[in-house]
Amino acid sequence: MAINIILLGPPGAGKGTQARRLIDERGLVQLSTGDMLREARSSGTEMGKRVAEVMDRGELVTDEIVIGLIREKLGQGGKGFIFDGFPRTLAQADALQALMAEMDQRIDAVIEMRVDDAALVSRISGRFTCGNCGEVYHDVTKPTKEPGKCDVCGSTDLRRRADDNEESLKTRLMEYYKKTSPLIGYYYVKGNLNPVDGLAEIDEVAAQVAKVMDKIPA
């Protein structure tokens, strides 16, 4: 049976880094809401046309549409899926739970990346990425070996997100805690919440995630 996990954590907690490792090491597929919407929009399918119409009107895509896209992805099979950025609310969590039951699947583990807010702001405000290959760097903890040049691909296209500044980060954290924090209690009650230390070294976080994954029944 496919393994389905949810990654929870505030912006910059390291969800993307750990998702990439799970993709590479365990063959899971990452289901990112943004990626699914962009893919659907360009697909030309009936669902894709609905997505395009909503986005072209500048409106938010409904939970019903997102669940429809997830249903399509789950129907394609595979070793399993990583839910990143969904669910964000209790209503979405309930809808996902119902979809899983309908498709005779389950959420095997919810991995919560726990972080200290002040440390998180420090971490993200120094972050930049390679626009070519996506490698992530940090001014203090992971600078490039050669200033202005990516260690991996050699590109000089190094970028900082416009909202990776202290004020914007505090706003994003407040939004996360207001909307998404209730999910922690939701999945705790269901018995599949697994906290990990999101501020540990990347390899240590990966080791904690691996322990969670290895406990999932085959």
UniProtKB/Swiss-Prot annotation:
Catalysed reactions, as listed in the record: AMP + ATP = 2 ADP
Query: What residues bind ATP, as annotated?
Result: G12, A13, G14, K15, G16, T17, R127, V136, Y137, A200
Keyword annotations for this protein?
Answer: ATP-binding, Cytoplasm, Kinase, Metal-binding, Nucleotide biosynthesis, Nucleotide-binding, Transferase, Zinc
Q: Which residues bind Zn(2+)?
A: C130, C133, C150, C153
Predominant subcellular localization, coarse grouping: cytoplasm
Q: Name the Enzyme Commission number(s) assigned to this protein.
A: 2.7.4.3
Please give the InterPro entries that the UniProt record associates with this protein.
Adenyl_kin_sub, Adenylat/UMP-CMP_kin, Adenylat_kinase_CS, Adenylate_kinase_lid-dom, P-loop_NTPase
- Localization of this protein: Cytoplasm
Q: Which GO molecular function terms does the record list?
A: adenylate kinase activity; ATP binding; zinc ion binding
Cross-referenced Pfam families: ADK, ADK_lid
This protein's assembly is summarised as: Monomer.
UniProt domain comment = Consists of three domains, a large central CORE domain and two small peripheral domains, NMPbind and LID, which undergo movements during catalysis. The LID domain closes over the site of phosphoryl transfer upon ATP binding. Assembling and dissambling the active center during each catalytic cycle provides an effective means to prevent ATP hydrolysis. Some bacteria have evolved a zinc-coordinating structure that stabilizes the LID domain.
Role, per record: Catalyzes the reversible transfer of the terminal phosphate group between ATP and AMP. Plays an important role in cellular energy homeostasis and in adenine nucleotide metabolism.
Question: Which NCBIfam families does the UniProt entry name for this protein?
Answer: adk, PRK00279.1-2, PRK00279.1-3, PRK14527.1, PRK14532.1
Q: What name does the UniProt record give this protein?
A: Adenylate kinase
What is the originating organism of this protein?
A: Paracoccus denitrificans
Q: What are the top taxonomic ranks of the organism?
A: Bacteria, Pseudomonadati, Pseudomonadota, Alphaproteobacteria, Rhodobacterales
